[in-house]
Regions:
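Short, compositionally biased
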Residues: 1-146, 223, 256-267
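C-terminal, surface-exposed recognition/capping segments
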Residues: 23-25, 99, 107-267
Length: 267
């Protein structure tokens, strides 16, 4: 069973008690793909399988599916790979009816070039979200309360920033921990963070390269958007970025249709 790690109080007196593993992980064993857990789209309850081997990202927004574990239906039949069954134009209703469908961001090739000779590519959900109606509180980022879309088990919830905007991952600092090159992960305060890769927002395919392993841990708080949403309509979710090649851990933001890891905290 999972144990808890409680952070030291920040300047606002806030603490978070984290599970010792990613949501869906079967173990905290270093180097085991069973420690990776599941991947989630921001604000969505439904999980997607992580990797069981390294995959390679292609340049044309399509992804290799090698390394994706086999998933079976109730009749013990192997289901198609998730990257091959991803759909566009997601809604809450569709996600409830089809929890195993990854709703990717739609790209449309216009065939028209811009002033620099590059093709103009449009997307239908210009926010970069997987769902047609975006909501900053799908995971309690505004209310700081557990919601019906929260995938964490009873007594736990998705971590969000506190009332003063402080991140729950401020305690994670590259120079305060140790990068484990052999097992491809980061350890600090006895807590193990494997690099899990992601499911790409454009396809639902896995992106996990052996040459540059990385991980993203979702935070239920929205990422900063542009002040001019009419011109730059992208909406984001915050996440903790863990990558060795840049020698850093930092809170960043990504499109909400991206599939990333998640680590629950005590309510």
């Amino acid at each position: 069973s999972a144990s808890l790690f409680t952070t030291a109080p920040n300047a606002s007196g806030t603490t978070w008690s984290f599970m010792d593993r990613n949501l869906g992980a079967l173990t905290v064993e270093r180097g085991s793909f069973d420690s990776h857990g599941l991947l989630y789209q921001w604000g969505r309850k439904d999980p997607f399988p992580g990797t069981t081997a390294f995959t390679i990202m292609n340049e044309d927004y399509t992804y290799e599916v090698d390394g994706e574990p086999e998933v079976y239906d109730i009749d013990n039949r192997v289901l198609p790979k998730f990257g091959l069954t991803a759909e566009f134009h997601g809604t809450i209703e569709k996600s409830v009816q089809n929890p195993a469908v990854f709703y990717a961001m739609t790209y449309k090739h216009t065939g028209v070039e811009d002033e620099y000779g590059e093709e103009i590519v449009e997307n239908d959900y210009k926010t970069g979200d997987w769902v047609d109606v975006s909501n900053d509180d799908y995971w309690g980022g505004e209310s700081r309360k557990k919601t019906i879309y929260d995938p964490c088990p009873v007594g736990y919830k998705v971590p969000v920033c506190d009332a003063d905007g402080n991140t729950p991952y401020a305690w994670l600092v590259y120079t305060a921990g140790k990068w484990d090159e052999a097992n491809r992960g980061f350890e600090q305060e006895g807590q193990w963070f494997p690099t899990t890769g992601t499911r790409a927002y454009a396809s639902g395919g896995l992106d996990y390269t052996e040459a540059n392993p990385y991980s993203g841990l979702w935070i239920g708080t929205k990422g900063k958007a542009s002040d001019n949403l009419e011109l730059y309509p992208d909406l984001y979710g915050q996440y903790m970025f863990i990558i060795d090649s840049k020698r850093m851990l930092k809170v960043s933001k990504d499109k909400r249709s991206q599939g990333m890891s998640l680590r629950c905290v005590k309510e």
